[in-house]
């Protein structure tokens, strides 16, 4: 029996790496599609890879990724593409769905991988400007003023695919605070009360589900900063935290960001913040790096062995011309990667460099604003980034 198990494990270890996709577009620089580690081999990235080894070979363990950014992340297509690629590496290794937020109650778009709806009276706050509300890992909050407020979260993706991944959970952590008490309505009617602290309420649902309805009881108000959906066993999970228009300075406004990151405890944080930092006339690379230093310190205080991956930023246009700050930001990313033993993916270079956003637009991959991508474009970016990650993983 032991010999059989050993042979099976050995076969898993020598399986060939997934075939790299050949770029269908001549403007993509496949030769640049690698993870750069300017500071030399990253111990934290190697630790992440070893945890992934354990999960892929034995089916055991817990691997968690957090993707942080602006509208590129809030839209959800890029993050979900990465999530699906990781889960395709081994059947049945999906962990909990992770961090979610009722974006519809805030009057903004929900990531494509789930849907949200709301009832009652809600107000909202984001990290884009100073707010009276405490903000955390999602960078947003919605405030319930009375018991008429309800939200429903459904994990069935709005974008249906042939091989549909189904995410189920039976553990819910509600991130928020207030005098109203959050409750779950099971099957739309039975009340489930949670336990917890001032800033977190934990619920154990007696069955697996892919949707929940959150309501409130009592008097007063409640500030809801997000929910974490999980299972009692391990696996791979990727949580996204994206706020349209958010810059590095925006995320520093989130005073509970570090505290709530303990709930995710990421092994890898992918930072896709930067495109909004370069939209003004006064981009300051030193300030940009200083903001990132503080964000990274907060991550490493939660998990000192957490790997950091800077995705860089894409080519973009401003005032009908190529944004001249992009290359300065790219240089800053490389310097940060060297300073923190992090990895850097040259999104700007891989997509074709200066002016390439116009070519992506012509190919139906970018929007007319030459800042954002189409769904097909975000999927392609996800494919390219995942290929670079897997080349680094299998090329050790």
Regions found by a protein language model. Give the residues of each.
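Positively charged n-region of N-terminal signal peptides that target proteins for export
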Residues: 1-4
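Hydrophobic h-region of N-terminal signal peptides that target proteins for export
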Residues: 9-18
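Short glycine- and acidic-rich boundary segments immediately preceding or forming the N-terminal edge
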Residues: 19-52, 178
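Conserved SGNH/GDSL esterase-like catalytic core that processes O-acyl groups on lipids
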Residues: 74-179, 184-185, 195-290, 372
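Active-site segments of SGNH/GDSL-like serine hydrolases
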Residues: 270-276, 297-330, 346
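Catalytic His-Asp segment of secreted/periplasmic serine-dependent ester chemistry enzymes
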Residues: 315-396
């Amino acid at each position: 029996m032991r010999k059989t198990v050993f042979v099976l494990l050995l076969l898993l270890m020598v399986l060939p790496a997934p075939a790299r996709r050949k770029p269908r577009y001549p403007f993509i620089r496949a030769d640049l599609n690698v993870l750069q580690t300017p500071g030399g081999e990253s111990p934290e990235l190697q630790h992440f890879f070893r945890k992934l080894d354990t999960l892929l070979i034995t089916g055991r363990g817990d691997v968690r990724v957090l993707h942080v950014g602006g509208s590129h992340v809030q839209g959800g297509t890029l993050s979900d593409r990465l999530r699906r690629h990781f889960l395709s590496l081994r059947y049945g290794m999906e962990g909990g769905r992770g961090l979610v937020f009722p974006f519809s109650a805030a009057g903004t778009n929900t990531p494509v991988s789930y849907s949200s709806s709301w009832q009652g009276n809600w107000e909202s706050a984001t990290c884009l400007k100073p707010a009276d509300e405490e903000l955390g890992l999602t960078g947003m909050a919605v405030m319930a003023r009375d018991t008429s407020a309800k939200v429903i979260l459904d994990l069935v993706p709005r974008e249906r695919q042939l091989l549909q991944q189904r995410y189920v959970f039976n553990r819910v952590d509600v991130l928020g605070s207030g005098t109203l008490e959050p409750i779950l309505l099971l099957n739309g009617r039975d009340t489930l009360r949670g336990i917890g602290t001032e800033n977190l309420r934990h619920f154990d649902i007696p069955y697996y589900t892919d949707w929940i309805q959150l309501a409130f009881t009592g008097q007063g108000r409640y500030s809801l900063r997000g929910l974490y959906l999980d299972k009692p066993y391990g696996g791979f999970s990727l949580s996204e935290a994206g706020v349209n228009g958010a810059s590095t300075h925006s995320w520093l406004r989130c005073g509970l960001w570090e505290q709530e990151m303990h709930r995710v405890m990421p092994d890898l944080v992918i930072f896709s913040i930067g495109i909004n930092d370069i939209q003004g006339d006064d981009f300051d690379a030193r300030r940009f790096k200083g903001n990132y230093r503080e964000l990274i310190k907060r991550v490493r205080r939660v998990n000192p062995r957490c790997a950091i991956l800077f995705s860089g930023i894409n080519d973009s246009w401003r005032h009908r011309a190529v944004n001249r700050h992009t290359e300065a930001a790219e240089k800053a990313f490389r310097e940060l990667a060297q300073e923190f033993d992090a990895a850097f993916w040259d999104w700007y270079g891989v997509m074709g460099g200066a002016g390439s956003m116009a070519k992506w637009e012509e190919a139906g991959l970018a929007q007319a604003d030459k800042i954002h991508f189409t769904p097909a474009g975000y999927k392609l970016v996800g494919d390219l980034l995942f290929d670079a990650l897997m080349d680094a993983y299998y090329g050790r």
